[in-house]
């Protein structure tokens, strides 16, 4: 019994220093475990974001305009737990407002003086190139339309074979046009072995034809485009290839980007003529009616610009009226079926794809771009633009008064002011707000009785909403990660003041354009329960 008492006394004596040490740690650095709450304010600056607008002074057409970013600010609210001495886990929410950026527009001045000489052609200030063609997925309605394309009637019979005669090519013109417009495939291509000759596109020769074959098919098979059965197999094969290689971007977004690019290219000329060019893109969920209205709006603005400059330069520049003649596919207009919502989405995509095909290699748009290039390089363009900005008519002294609204305000787009000094205006490129929720882990690096230095890592989700180019965007949710370094000051018993600097990285782009990566400083008060 005495032995047991001695052992218990020894163990009790050994435990006393350990208990005292634990109490001292709690008194020194506030290292006691337990829950806490934190509230604070945050502010900072935006990094890693670039404008989507090209610099008009860049002849290569690749340099973006500089963005002037604002200083976002907001508040934080968090709850956490000190899980071990010097280590804590935290769940926090941060709200950031004023996530805003502006871009310079209408820039004139010394750079405008470079092109102010009337005796020399105006140097290229920006590259004018129509949007590149984009091949869209072929829908079922497009496929059926292609299958039912007949041959053009002929007066006499010609051979059906690999090498079509001139008359046969004329008979297959509608089918060849379908291949080009819907699949982006040229029927005849230059012969690699003889550049002077042309052969049937090898892509068409690789599409299987005929009934099932037990033996492996030949790599290259004859292509008889005038043969109806052969043509049916050709259309089905081309459709399968199109859908297998279809882009991940929706047809509505492709159409919107093309229209925005065209508006951006013609805007300097439109401003000189006093024509207002919209800046709002198509919403991602645009209806068939919205797509049709947008195409009509594009048609009207391009033709108004053309009409404004008709007669400014020689030849037949700006002489031909622009008529895009966009029509909603009839099969999609009906939009009836058991799955109405899915049918509606399919109709929207089909309408957008049809609109993209109208813009692909559009001869009227290409002609307008060429005429604008001539206008831009004309030796007397500066004087002509100044007259357009000052008069209530076209460059010939007449015209509609409506085309001159605001011309005096926008004359900086055509040349420098009389004093040689220009002005810069700023346009808001985006104005957003963010709600960020993160789980963070903190560890103390250095601890004293009065303060501690800590570092932390976090990960979570960011919810972003607001406007881009003045248009409300669809809310974006994406992954974020952050790193922080801070100082915690022991202000009172259980109360700490956290002064922290952090960086947050976004893994996704808003509207596939902007990656918001802010540097932030925060000031918070933490209370340990």
UniProtKB/Swiss-Prot annotation:
Keywords in alphabetical order: Cell membrane, Membrane, Signal, Transmembrane, Transmembrane helix, Virulence
Regions of biased composition (Basic and acidic residues) lie at 106-116
Q: Where in the cell is it found?
A: Cell membrane
Indicate how the chain sits in the lipid bilayer.
Multi-pass membrane protein
Question: A GO CC term?
Answer: plasma membrane
Leader peptide range in chain numbering? 1-22
Task: Write down the superkingdom of origin.
Answer: Bacteria
Bilayer-spanning residue ranges: 67-87, 477-492
User: Major place of localization?
Assistant: membrane
**Record's Gene3D superfamilies?**
2.40.160.20
Region: Disordered; residue ranges are 106-134, 392-424
For this protein, the record's InterPro entries field holds: OMP/PagP_b-brl, TSA
Q: What does this protein do?
A: May be an adherent factor for rickettsial adsorption to the host-cell surface and a determinant of virulence of individual rickettsial strain. It is the major outer membrane protein.
Q: What is this protein called?
A: 56 kDa type-specific antigen
Q: What species is given as this protein's source? A: Orientia tsutsugamushi (Rickettsia tsutsugamushi)
